Amino acid sequence: MEPLLQNISDTARWVAVFRAEESDRPDAVFHDPYARRLAGERGEQIADAIGFSRQNSWSFVARTFLFDNLVMQHVAEGYNTIINLAAGLDTRPYRMALPSALRWVEVDLPGILTYKEHIMAAEKPVCRLESIKLDLADRTQRLALFRQLGKETSKALIITEGLMIYLDALEAAELAENLSEQQSFRRWAFDLVSPALLAMSQKEMGPVLKEANIVFKFAPGEGEDFFRPYGWKPIVSYSKLKTAATLNRLSEEMKAFAAMPEPEGPVRPFPWTGACLFENMNSSQ
């Protein structure tokens, strides 16, 4: 029997399930009317197989909520380009109230973007959407793309939602350095986990992911400061647990954890995950 997860792109189907479930709630904090179609039956099966993620679906809800807010914040600040790396099945260019003049560039592997284009064929994005099919692991292609986009925009926000945990430290450092070389890439938002949460996630979800040769890797001990040598200054980080608590998405047990004081980062010797925003130190703001 084929494994449920066959490649890294299948994780996008898995995550889409949680966006669909949140969207179905009467008190939903965001609405993604396309998520269930995109997840498909396989997405549901994957989510069911990874019980730990089902029990902690609040983390995915909080992440989507936080990234939605970061996008809207930067649009309000006059950012004219959003570049979504490893975009997967993201539908923000269709579901959010974005300016029609906003340029939205999504980059991911050909397979997942072709699948999304097929499902979304009858839908119309609200902004200027460009889909670029490219393997971000290919350094030559990646650099060429970044240089091209860097010349074409003056004020871009980069988002890499759900990507960093799959990189190793060298890959994360190279990506950070490549991005910071483009002065017009003013800010970068991504989610990060602490070493303690990485170990927990590897234990609870690792066996299912391993079938598809997918491994959780990246959780720098120095937290956000890992990125300073590569041109990125931390601005703010939002705890997913604290966010989920304010959204009333936690179980009673998790509410007790959320009520505890959370020590300031960037070094966090406890299970933690959050959405982090960085400023390009090579940019003239």
Can you name each region flagged by the protein language model?
Residues 1-83, 87-132, 139-140, 146-148, ...:
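Rossmann-like AdoMet
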Residues 157, 182-195:
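Conserved beta-strand signature within the Rossmann-like core of class I S-adenosyl-L-methionine
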Residues 139-142, 166-182:
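A short, conserved alpha-helix within the catalytic core of class I
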Residues 214-239:
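Short alpha-helix
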Residues 198-214:
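Short, glycine-/aromatic-enriched active-site segment of Class I SAM-dependent methyltransferases
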Residues 270-285:
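C-terminal lobe and adjacent flexible extensions of AdoMet/dcAdoMet transferase-like proteins
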